[in-house]
């Protein structure tokens, strides 16, 4: 698998979740922020990152930088969907991803929807099973998308001619 250069792609970012974290110290509470960000070019490349900082914009910037280092390629077939059904796991979170016919749209919960839209999937069904924490859902959706192989890749692996 070759390295993906994020500078060659026209990436857009979506903030999935921002959380305020409190550290209790002697004088009171110190607040910092973490931002879960998904980036994608809308044509098969997608990545996620978690940024942490004392200010929200800085946390988002760090999340985008990390997401660019964590890009994967998603095989998209005709009808702008995935080739077959897959189940992604992360911790207690599971995401079932199914291909859909043209015109269906993205039917997915908030965190998973951001991943699919950033990847450029326009017709896909998904269901979050188990944990619906945004961090677990995004990582489980990524696990599912990582498992996908294009039909050509599967045929080559099986030694079948096109």
Swiss-Prot record:
Q: Which taxonomic lineage does the organism of this UniProt entry have? A: Bacteria, Pseudomonadati, Thermodesulfobacteriota, Desulfuromonadia, Geobacterales
Matching InterPro entries: Ribosomal_Su5_D2-typ_SF, Ribosomal_uS5, Ribosomal_uS5_bac-type, Ribosomal_uS5_C, Ribosomal_uS5_N, Ribosomal_uS5_N_CS, Ribsml_uS5_D2-typ_fold_subgr
Which species does the entry assign this protein to?
A: Geobacter metallireducens (strain ATCC 53774 / DSM 7210 / GS-15)
Q: Which UniProt keywords apply?
A: Ribonucleoprotein, Ribosomal protein, RNA-binding, rRNA-binding
Q: What is this protein called?
A: Small ribosomal subunit protein uS5
One Gene Ontology MF term: rRNA binding
The answer, when asked if Ribosomal protein is one of the entry's keywords, is: yes
What is the gene called? rpsE
The free-text function statement in the UniProt record for this protein reads: With S4 and S12 plays an important role in translational accuracy. Located at the back of the 30S subunit body where it stabilizes the conformation of the head with respect to the body.
Q: Name one GO biological process term.
A: translation
